[in-house]
């Protein structure tokens, strides 16, 4: 127990979208807001970038530890265009909005320890198999050929500039 009860170095969390709750009549959490009218991912999840501002802010205030996004991203219907490239503008927009909110948290003093995109490459997902694409790099499942999507180039630029272009 002594070994596994050491203090945490940081708090990490996978975050994809916000869920707003309120106390129900029995005191248990009840979903309070439906995100009708919000943009959605290919699997119907609402696009709520402000969650990358409020979640790190809340968690740092509560736990006093640096905060890390251990997974954030979206499913999209991606394909290789006639130019041989993958133009996943929805994912670029998603990342710009979410990383912009994350940057705002840093500017407001939240100690951010990192961000990991979901996922580097299109892959097998337990809930969706190969039917959805989550990666920054397109995977041709028949040939295993990889093609950088526009979102990969966008994220590369974010990393190179430490988010200055957000």
Language-model region placement:
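Non-catalytic scaffold segments within catalytic domains of secreted glycoside hydrolases
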Residues: 1-166
């Amino acid at each position: 127990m002594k070994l596994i009860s050491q203090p945490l170095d940081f708090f990490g969390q996978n975050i994809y979208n916000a869920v707003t709750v309120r106390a129900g009549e029995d005191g248990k959490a009840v979903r309070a807001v439906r995100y009708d009218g919000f943009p959605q991912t290919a699997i119907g999840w609402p696009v709520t970038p402000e969650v990358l501002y409020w979640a790190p802010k809340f968690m740092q205030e509560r736990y006093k530890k640096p905060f890390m996004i251990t997974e954030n991203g979206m499913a999209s219907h991606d394909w290789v265009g006639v130019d041989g490239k993958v133009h996943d503008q929805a994912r670029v927009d998603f990342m710009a909005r979410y990383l912009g909110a994350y940057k705002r948290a840093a500017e407001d003093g939240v100690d951010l320890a990192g961000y990991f995109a979901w996922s580097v490459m299109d892959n097998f997902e337990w809930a969706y198999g190969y039917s959805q694409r989550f990666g920054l790099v397109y995977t041709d499942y028949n040939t295993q050929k990889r093609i950088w999507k526009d979102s990969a180039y966008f994220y590369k630029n974010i990393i190179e500039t430490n988010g200055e272009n957000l």
